[in-house]
Amino acid sequence: MIEPEFKDGLLPVIVQDYETLEVLMFAYMNREAFDLTCSTGIAHYFSRSRGKLWKKGETSGHYQHVKEMRIDCDRDCLLILVEQDTGACHTGYRSCFYRTIEGDVVGEKTFEPADVYKN
């Protein structure tokens, strides 16, 4: 296995749908998230804002099943191809990239956040 380089303890990750190649999200992994992703086949990330590890889908049930992991030429960025359950974005869209810079919604809404993220 090619060992990634974690700059300041983090590794940028681009996530794409395995079949359509749609870009679903961008996140970071720390070493623990990387190791858990490799060992479980379910994507784990590190939340910079919350300062903690997170298993994608742990709250929503919208897991990312890892099909393939690719590393860039400098070994400092990952591309993960996943089978996405429902939507990747906490706002209810399939992709976090669901709108243009002008504000036009171009993505597919796949769930209502209020129905999923109940306190």
Curated annotation (Swiss-Prot):
Domain of life: Archaea
Binding annotation for Mg(2+): D72, D74, D76
Enzyme Commission number(s) of this protein: 3.5.4.19
Cofactor: Mg(2+); Zn(2+)
GO BP term (any one): L-histidine biosynthetic process
Enzyme class: hydrolase
Gene Ontology cellular-component terms listed: cytoplasm
Compartments, record wording: Cytoplasm
Coiled-coil regions, chain positions: none
Catalytic activity: 1-(5-phospho-beta-D-ribosyl)-5'-AMP + H2O = 1-(5-phospho-beta-D-ribosyl)-5-[(5-phospho-beta-D-ribosylamino)methylideneamino]imidazole-4-carboxamide
NCBIfam families reported for this sequence: PRK00051.1
Complex formation: Homodimer.
Biological role: Catalyzes the hydrolysis of the adenine ring of phosphoribosyl-AMP.
Family as reported in the entry's similarity comment: Belongs to the PRA-CH family.
Protein name, as recorded: Phosphoribosyl-AMP cyclohydrolase
Organism this protein belongs to: Methanocella arvoryzae (strain DSM 22066 / NBRC 105507 / MRE50)
Protein's gene: hisI
